[in-house]
UniProtKB/Swiss-Prot annotation:
<keyword id="KW-0496">Mitochondrion</keyword>
<feature type="binding site">
    <location>
        <position position="194"/>
    </location>
    <ligand>
        <name>Cu cation A2</name>
    </ligand>
</feature>
<keyword id="KW-0999">Mitochondrion inner membrane</keyword>
<comment type="similarity">
    <text>Belongs to the cytochrome c oxidase subunit 2 family.</text>
</comment>
<keyword id="KW-0186">Copper</keyword>
<dbReference type="InterPro" id="IPR034210">
    <property type="entry name" value="CcO_II_C"/>
</dbReference>
<feature type="binding site">
    <location>
        <position position="202"/>
    </location>
    <ligand>
        <name>Cu cation A2</name>
    </ligand>
</feature>
<dbReference type="GO" id="GO:0004129">
    <property type="term" value="F:cytochrome-c oxidase activity"/>
</dbReference>
<dbReference type="InterPro" id="IPR036257">
    <property type="entry name" value="Cyt_c_oxidase_su2_TM_sf"/>
</dbReference>
<protein>
    <recommendedName>
        <fullName>Cytochrome c oxidase subunit 2</fullName>
        <ecNumber>7.1.1.9</ecNumber>
    </recommendedName>
</protein>
<keyword id="KW-1133">Transmembrane helix</keyword>
<feature type="topological domain" description="Mitochondrial intermembrane">
    <location>
        <begin position="1"/>
        <end position="25"/>
    </location>
</feature>
<feature type="topological domain" description="Mitochondrial matrix">
    <location>
        <begin position="48"/>
        <end position="62"/>
    </location>
</feature>
<feature type="binding site">
    <location>
        <position position="205"/>
    </location>
    <ligand>
        <name>Cu cation A1</name>
    </ligand>
</feature>
<feature type="binding site">
    <location>
        <position position="194"/>
    </location>
    <ligand>
        <name>Cu cation A1</name>
    </ligand>
</feature>
<keyword id="KW-0479">Metal-binding</keyword>
<feature type="binding site">
    <location>
        <position position="196"/>
    </location>
    <ligand>
        <name>Cu cation A2</name>
    </ligand>
</feature>
């Protein structure tokens, strides 16, 4: 989860988040190198005493500053397309979970497990030993290291189901069903929030996921049934 004065990404807990962070680091390195080169050229032009008033064109320079950006864009393009494909491609999910957005809470359904369903509301942040605006009365429980399919929609306005540590952000749109892969690498509790302004209590729509062992997940399912 995010902490005060945190400028980096949250600790990754999915393979998609790992890929996104690696891609971000690569793009940032390219941006830093381009910015450094640009600043150096500008300073050099201002500080050197040489000038050529008759230099009107240089085909070699024009070829270089056309080809190099094309190469850089291709270097950025292919990893980006690969990550987009991996996130959107649903490959043999073990089961599906449906997430339904409401103003201003989430509902969850487990169709393959006797159609378990429950609502998830934010807890009063005045209670002690809880994270402000992040704790919910019912957690979405998933087994770790097992590929799942998340299906999301909405009953009223557009919401966005977002869990940064899992590298997930998908819009919940009324009358439309969106889906994506969901997999957790290790056990823990992970927090997210609605990331689409959806009305007065938009800030009070937390998402709380508990990732646990498969045996514990089955025990939880039996208790819900």
């Amino acid at each position: 989860m995010s902490t005060w004065f945190m400028f980096m990404f949250q600790e990754s807990n999915s393979y998609y988040a790992d890929n996104l962070i690696s891609f971000h680091n690569m793009v940032m390195m390219i941006i830093i190198m381009i910015s450094t080169l640009t600043v150096y050229i500008i300073l050099d032009l201002f500080m050197n005493k040489f000038s050529n008033l008759f230099l009107l064109k240089n085909h070699n320079i024009e070829i270089i500053w056309t080809i190099i950006p094309i190469i850089i864009l291709l270097i950025i393009c292919f990893p980006s397309l690969k990550i987009l494909y991996l996130i959107d491609e649903i490959v043999n999910p073990f089961f599906s979970i449906k997430s339904i957005g409401h103003q201003w809470y989430w509902s969850y359904e487990y169709p393959e497990f006797n159609n378990i369903e429950f609502d998830s509301y934010m807890l009063n942040y005045n209670n002690l030993n809880q994270f402000r605006l992040l704790e919910t009365d019912n957690r979405m429980v998933i087994p770790m290291k097992i590929p799942l399919r998340l299906i999301t929609t909405s009953t009223d306005v557009i919401h966005s189901w977002t869990v940064p540590s899992l590298g997930i952000k998908v819009d919940a749109v009324p009358g439309r069903i969106n889906q994506l892969n969901l997999i957790s690498k290790r056990p823990g509790i992970f927090f997210g929030q609605c990331s689409e302004i959806c009305g007065m209590n938009h800030s009070f729509m937390p998402i709380m996921i508990e990732s646990t062992s498969f045996q514990y997940f089955l025990n939880w399912v039996n208790k819900q049934i």
